[in-house]
């Protein structure tokens, strides 16, 4: 072997040596006999370096995995012998191999097993066991090999490459069950028995193996007195009990007859209870309690599955026994649910949830069951509470886990509300009222959870459209009382961000309360508009409040009229466009400011003011933005530093975004025109459009202005049209693929909306736009530049979408009036799009365009020469495209393209009649060497009045035609 290259295997080697080692590995993988050198090195213990040994196993692994079938029988025998002699040598080694080497060896054994067990090596396990006997090192390797085999055969995390490998794995398992599983199980029993006092590591490994295999072997081999008693014995040994717990969990989880499962679980529980495992509070080892909690959860859920099956089968007596068995586990479940360790509590939630599901199905609940429901409710309320360690300013992994845990508890609360809505409402009301009575002297986490529970009731007790304050009188009045307490108690002043946020979340969730008791709106508005909300010291609170305030105002727009000017005055400072200089930190981020602008726009538009007042208020809102925009644009034109340019461009873009966001409140009932605001937005357009001619930061500025234009086309309608030509001219200068791709939807929007009104403009800019597109598409790019290829593909799609919009909007004369040469160029590109590019989305669009053009121009009075074009180009395209190898009829998008291809052929037949059939019969299809009877069949299908019949036929036609 190349000793120099092997030096690079050491993790501390320099990069040149490491590169050489990698290259050597690739070389050995390709070489037909290099593996033999590695096999020999392993068998003869040539190398003592661990990394070299690992390397040798890697080479062998590659050989077995990818090239085994190429080896001769003698070579395959050599690999078997090498591995067995290596295994034999491990018995005598003074020191065991490193774990990573043992694991890699086990993987190679497992790969060889999967390859050879059914054919050449049926005695695989007997050979291994005869080598390892009861030698602890041998047993360790035997167990690792078993785990590696389980991974290959059944591990859910391993993606098996094909259906064939899945079937082969099933066959291997079936054969193992018949031939060797009882012997393997016996070997596990012997290992567990012989090593129980001497080698805890081997015992843990063995328990892991039993847990893994129990899912697919005959359960009676494990679930018997001999085995279970031994496992229960291990539960009392500190170093073994976690693995024993997991092993029992796998046994309990195994599917089996419901009555047998019930008996198994009950016998386990009896022994565990007698041994004192149910006394959770005595146990200090939290890792073990977490595993035990998972086991109890498994036992509980197994009993519930048994109960469900028995009820379904009508076995009433057995079902009753199962229910009693479940009930006896509830006290233990509750102990685990309220455990201070959230992992332990989380592990039992599944059982708890399913238990409540049973109670929901029972016609009446016993007193004990009602008490259980109440106990679960108390547990949920307790466990929802934050602990002292929760870091609100810098939330890390622990905090994220608690948030997830809270989501699980929320599901429990929702399920509780399905079982007993009255209890849930009464419990929350009790806790809420008691806490808010003394909120000033109560710890933040208790105040937060009290408000949080009120918030959660909205989903736990669902109603349509948030109508919590009508309908059921007792529920409505309870919620009304709590909301009244929330907004009048002063708790919004609590000095903790979690309480503040929960307050605002809750008032917004129950916004309908303020339509019932509108007298509370001013005090809530004040909370939003002072140091408790938008001026809070915490950026997190300010940010969330900006969004919630917007929702609050919009949902109560009918109640807002008396407060509009006061609100607009108070938010004035928050509307300022943050100057991108001097490291100035504004109160809100630009994203948060979007919500404030949206709120301001909504207040003005939805107000009961006359149009002139609305116009004046909107002008006051947007004029400072326009003035600031002009100043910043001038600064950008003069800025030298690129970072400064980028920051100014961002600010300009924000200004455009803010103006755009104010227009969100307009609707069909409240149009810009009706509100008298057209001129303000036209002024904005005039202010923003000069940014398009700025040579700096083009991408950012164009993107912002383009988005604003999209919005104004909707809001201002034809009033926007005078601005479009010059805007388009600027946007077509110095274009990249992405610019064009984003510009075309703007033109599509104008075309689809205004149709004939924009015909002169479209005719004028049609060829300049096409030239810009073609110029970008024809630019050379590196063969392997995937992003450039993707950009071109997207631009091509946009181009065809544009042509589709033009033809689909009844504006085909825009194309027809471009002169014969240009028209032909456009038509050729559509044919190319339909045939030459393997992009089914573009192909579908091209066939839609072709159908439309045939419909418009394909009759007797169509443009001169178009009928020839139909027969020379469009008809062939309908055959050449689907015949291409890249046209995959198993792909959904491609099938849609074929469907449009069928429509095109049907349209040609509709417009040209018998002439089209004659052309297909006598000229075109014979030129493709189609058999006469198939030609006849094709033409008959084409002439069917039902288009669907032809679409289905066409798919079959091409499936037959393709090799």
Curated annotation (Swiss-Prot):
The keyword Transit peptide does not apply. InterPro entries: ARM-like, ARM-type_fold, Exportin-1/Importin-b-like, Exportin-T_C, Importin-beta_N, XPOT. It is found in: Nucleus; Cytoplasm. One of its GO terms (cellular component) is cytosol. GO terms for molecular function: small GTPase binding; tRNA binding. Keywords: Acetylation, Cytoplasm, Nucleus, RNA-binding, Transport, tRNA-binding. Its main location: nucleus. The modification N-acetylmethionine is found at residue 1. Coiled coil: none annotated. The modification N6-acetyllysine is found at residue 635. GO terms for biological process: intracellular protein transport; tRNA re-export from nucleus. It holds the Pfam family Xpo1. It comes from the Eukaryota. Found in a complex with XPOT, Ran and tRNA. Probably found in a complex with nucleoporins. Interacts with Ran and tRNA in a GTP-dependent manner. Mediates the nuclear export of aminoacylated tRNAs. In the nucleus binds to tRNA and to the GTPase Ran in its active GTP-bound form. Docking of this trimeric complex to the nuclear pore complex (NPC) is mediated through binding to nucleoporins. Upon transit of a nuclear export complex into the cytoplasm, disassembling of the complex and hydrolysis of Ran-GTP to Ran-GDP (induced by RANBP1 and RANGAP1, respectively) cause release of the tRNA from the export receptor. XPOT then return to the nuclear compartment and mediate another round of transport. PANTHER family: EXPORTIN-T (PTHR15952:SF11), EXPORTIN-T/LOS1 (PTHR15952). Belongs to the exportin family. This is Exportin-T. The gene is Xpot.
């Amino acid at each position: 072997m190349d000793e120099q290259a092997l030096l690079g295997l050491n993790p501390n080697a320099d990069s040149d040596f490491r590169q050489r080692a990698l290259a050597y590995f690739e070389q050995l993988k390709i070489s037909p006999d290099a593996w033999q050198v590695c096999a020999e090195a392993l068998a003869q213990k040539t190398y003592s370096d661990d990394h070299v040994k690992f390397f040798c196993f890697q080479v062998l692994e590659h050989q077995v995995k990818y090239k085994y079938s190429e080896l001769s029988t003698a070579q395959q025998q050599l690999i078997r012998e090498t591995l067995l002699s290596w295994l034999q040598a491990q018995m005598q080694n003074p020191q065991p191999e490193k774990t990573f080497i043992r694991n890699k060896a086990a993987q190679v054994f497992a790969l060889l097993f999967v390859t050879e067990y059914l054919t050449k090596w049926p005695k695989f396990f007997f050979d291994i066991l005869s080598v390892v006997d009861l030698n602890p090192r041998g047993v360790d390797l035997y167990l690792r090999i078993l785990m590696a085999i389980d991974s290959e055969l059944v591990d859910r995390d391993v993606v098996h490459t094909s259906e064939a490998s899945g079937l082969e794995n099933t066959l291997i398992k079936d054969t193992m069950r018949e031939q060797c599983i009882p012997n393997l199980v016996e070997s596990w029993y012997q290992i567990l028995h012989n090593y129980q006092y001497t080698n805890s590591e081997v015992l843990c490994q063995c328990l892991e193996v039993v847990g893994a295999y129990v899912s697919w072997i005959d359960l009676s081999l494990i679930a018997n007195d001999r085995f279970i008693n031994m496992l229960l014995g291990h539960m009392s040994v500190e170093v073994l009990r976690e693995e024993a717990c997991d092993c029992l969990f796998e046994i309990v989880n195994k599917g089996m007859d419901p009555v047998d499962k019930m008996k198994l679980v009950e016998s386990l529980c009896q022994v565990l209870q007698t041994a004192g495992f149910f006394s959770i509070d005595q146990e200090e080892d939290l890792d073990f309690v977490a595993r035990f909690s998972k086991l109890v959860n498994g036992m509980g859920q197994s009993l519930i599955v048994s109960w469900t099956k028995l009820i379904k089968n009508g076995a009433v007596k057995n079902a009753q026994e199962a229910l009693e068995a479940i009930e006896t586990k509830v006290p233990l479940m509750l102990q685990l649910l309220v455990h201070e360790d959230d992992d332990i509590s989380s592990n039992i939630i599944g059982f708890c949830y399913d238990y409540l599901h049973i109670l929901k199905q029972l016609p009446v609940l016993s007193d004990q069951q009602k008490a259980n429901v109440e106990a679960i409710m108390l547990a949920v309320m307790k466990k929802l509470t934050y602990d002292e360690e929760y870091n609100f300013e810098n939330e890390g992994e622990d905090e994220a886990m608690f948030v997830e845990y809270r989501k699980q508890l929320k599901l429990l609360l929702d399920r509780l509300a399905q079982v007993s809505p009255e209890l849930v409402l009464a419990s929350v009301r009790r806790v809420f009222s008691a806490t808010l009575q003394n909120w000033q002297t109560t710890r933040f986490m208790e105040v937060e959870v009290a408000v949080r529970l009120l918030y959660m009731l909205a989903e736990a007790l669902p109603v349509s459209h948030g109508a919590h304050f009508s309908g059921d009188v007792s529920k409505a009045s309870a919620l009304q009382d709590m909301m009244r307490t929330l907004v009048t108690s002063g708790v919004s002043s609590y000095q903790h961000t979690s309480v503040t946020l929960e307050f605002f979340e809750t008032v917004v969730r129950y916004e309908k309360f303020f339509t019932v008791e509108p007298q509370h709106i001013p005090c809530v508005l004040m909370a939003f508009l002072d140091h408790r909300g938008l001026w809070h010291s915490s950026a997190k609170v300010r940010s969330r409040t900006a969004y919630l305030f917007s929702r609050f105002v919009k949902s109560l727009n009918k109640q807002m009229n008396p407060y509009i000017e006061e609100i607009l005055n108070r938010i004035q400072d928050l509307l300022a466009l943050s100057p991108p200089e001097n490291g100035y930190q504004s109160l809100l981020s630009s994203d948060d400011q979007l919500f404030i602008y949206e709120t301001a726009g909504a207040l003005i538009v939805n107000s009961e003011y006359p149009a002139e007042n609305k116009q004046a208020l909107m002008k006051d809102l947007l004029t400072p933005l326009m003035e600031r925009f002009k100043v910043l644009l001038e600064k950008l034109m003069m800025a030298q530093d690129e970072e400064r340019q980028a920051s100014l461009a961002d600010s300009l873009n924000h200004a455009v975004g803010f103006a755009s966001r104010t227009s969100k409140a307009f609707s069909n009932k409240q149009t810009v025109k009706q509100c008298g605001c057209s001129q303000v937005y036209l002024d904005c357009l005039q202010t923003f459009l000069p940014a398009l001619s700025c040579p700096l930061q083009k991408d950012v500025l164009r993107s912002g202005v383009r988005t604003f234009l999209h919005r104004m086309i909707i809001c201002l309608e034809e009033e926007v049209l005078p601005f479009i030509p010059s805007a388009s001219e600027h946007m077509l200068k110095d274009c990249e693929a992405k610019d064009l791709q984003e510009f075309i939807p703007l033109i599509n929007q104008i075309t689809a909306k205004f149709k004939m009104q924009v015909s002169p403009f479209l005719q004028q800019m049609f060829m300049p736009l096409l030239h810009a597109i073609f110029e970008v598409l024809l630019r050379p790019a590196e063969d392997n530049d995937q992003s450039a290829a993707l950009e071109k593909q997207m631009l091509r799609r946009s181009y065809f979408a544009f042509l589709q919009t033009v033809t689909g909007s009844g504006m085909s004369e825009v194309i027809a009036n471009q002169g014969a040469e240009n028209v032909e160029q456009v038509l050729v590109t559509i044919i190319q799009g339909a045939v030459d590019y393997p992009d089914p989305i573009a192909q579908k669009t091209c066939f839609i365009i072709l159908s439309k053009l045939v419909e418009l121009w394909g009759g007797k009075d169509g443009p001169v020469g178009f009928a020839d074009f139909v027969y020379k180009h469009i008809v062939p395209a309908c055959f050449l495209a689907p015949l291409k190898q890249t046209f995959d009829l198993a792909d959904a998008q491609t099938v849609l393209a074929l469907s449009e291809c069928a429509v095109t052929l049907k349209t040609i037949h509709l417009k040209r009649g018998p002439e089209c059939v004659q052309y297909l019969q006598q000229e075109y299809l014979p030129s493709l060497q189609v058999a006469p009877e198939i030609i006849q069949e094709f033409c008959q299908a084409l002439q069917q009045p039902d288009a669907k019949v032809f679409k289905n036929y066409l798919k079959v036609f091409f499936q037959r035609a393709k090799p």
